Amino acid sequence: MALTPGAVGAAHATATTATTQAPPLRGSVATPLPAAPALPGPALRSTPALAMAASAATSPLDLAAVKQAVELIGKGRVDEATNIESTISDPLARKLVEWLVLRSDNSSADFSRYAAFIAANPSWPSIVTLRRRAEAALWQGRADPSTVLAFFNGDPPRTAKGRFALARALLSQGDSARAQEAVSDAWRGDAFSGDLEAQARTAFSGLIDTADDKARMDARLYAEDDDAGISAARHLDDTELAIARARVAVINRERNAKALLEAVPAAGQRDPGYIFSRAQWLRHSDKIAEAARWMQMAPHDPAALRDVDQWWVERRLLARKLLDLGDSKLAYAIASGAAAPNNENYRADQQFTAGWIALRFLHQPAVALPHFAHIADGASDPITLARAYYWQGRAAEAAGHERDARGYYETAARYPTAYYGQLARARLGLDEVTLRTPPEPRADLRGLELARVFDILYAIDARDVVVAMAGDIADKANDLAALVTLAEIARSHDDARATLRIGKKALGRGFPLELYAFPDFGIPNVEPIGPQVERHVIYAIVRQESEFNSRVVSGANAYGLMQVTAATDRDTAKRFNVAFDQRRLLNDVAYNVQIGSAELGNDISNWRGSYILDFVAYNAGPRRAKEWIEQYGDPRDPKVDPIDWIERIPLQETRYYVQRVIENMQVYRVRFDNSPKLWIESDLRRGS
């Protein structure tokens, strides 16, 4: 059933350089095959909430005022920005500054300002954030009960402060039952500071019972919020406090964790939270079989587990450790025995992991198939759906049901921008990646209120604000023409970040915005200082590493477009005889790309051309790449299945990263080569 394209030719190994300016959108992509099935998308609205009347063009004076307000807000001087707002004559520019003020962490606006903006602008970005701020203002400003009850009429609170404000209002009207319910919901489900906890204990002392404190203790410890967990435990008995202290020791990997676990009274050792931490400590201690035994003692009732998402994360780590030890049967039991997670991605991951173990390690396709089918439950994004149908195809194929397998592969192949959609196409012998063409931008929609907001922000070079708006808009808007208009504005300003943000979010919801989701601009032309790397590889990396943000600094202190660390910069600069200057990693985009692409090219050579190992090393370091070769075999070995090898990568982040970069490469080849040729199987085998 499989059909492998020929090996990548010599011409494919020649580097090209990128362009800085956004090229014309048309003509840069192959026309979709007539037989290619349409990707289902969300229902579209003909008259979107985005299409609101806009005022005339903003004057230079108003633009200067908006620019000054943005700068002041960035410095935390929000009240001064509010003063400037009152001097702006353009209503839309004034509204934009008000939105920026209300959205700021340093805003001192009262509830009435938040409520007025939310009521007048329900389709604006960040309304959920503004509503959360409004709830805080209700609590902190001790708003009168009628105001509080009116605000929450038909729209319940989202935050602890909102729930506490509602409870206070209900108590004032004698409704203690509903007040207790609001307090209990906050106590059991919300994260909040110690100061707010003290305020709430004083205000609602008669409404918080031991069950609330026990639930809070568990919830905060699953979230690894040590202080809040211990604080709640201090209102419980000695056994619960002992459990909490033992769990904190496990979370922090303290040397006395074992002693504290063993000191918990026998009755407390049946507590689900204790079982979780005991299994976690055993896994940390490489006592995997014993950890699995404890894990299997856990209850299956989600209510007893409290945090089914964290239980799944622990089970996933444990199941993979069991696979490493060769105990596939127990690994399957651990994975399949998990309570269904609440998080959509975790639910899909749990079903995939159980199905993958059943199919590829236990060789039981009939057991695997229903797991793979459940991956798609409630999913809408191409990556998840393609994975669901591809693996159903693999299970059906393994069971000898070729007709069913073909049907599953054909469904997966509807998602050609997704890794498993691309693999499904290769499995079917479809050697092309087809991208849908969005509708032409409509000039009449340039009058959209938010389109004009984009114009204002670009006029004052406030691109970070555009990016923040873009993601929220694309998450919620259902008007395709409006989304194309906003994406085209971003593209016309050479803003790869905002173009990507709109395209990527919208593509994940089924809209045909592939050409915006994979910008073919945003990386400057550079003279390579090391081995040349193809343009589609560099773009694939940048899209995943930084999403074209040249100023981003990661938690690991990686800098800029290609997320280069100072150590890499120093080593690469020395290797290729270039002056080392760490400051340039953020201040000089071309330098960042030179260093990053040189590192990438050097590593590709070191790994004999293997993209898989190069991308693993780029994300997780060469040491881990070598460790995983030792543990799982060499993906360059023809006897090793590269698809399974990638799925065996222990780090979730790196596993996801490699798949995303490989899928990005397939799309960027289409964009840059103007050819729909699919190379994914050759890419996975590169270096063999």
Regions inferred by a protein language model and the residue ranges of each:
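Compositionally biased, proline/threonine/alanine/serine-rich low-complexity intrinsically disordered stretches
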Residues: 2-62
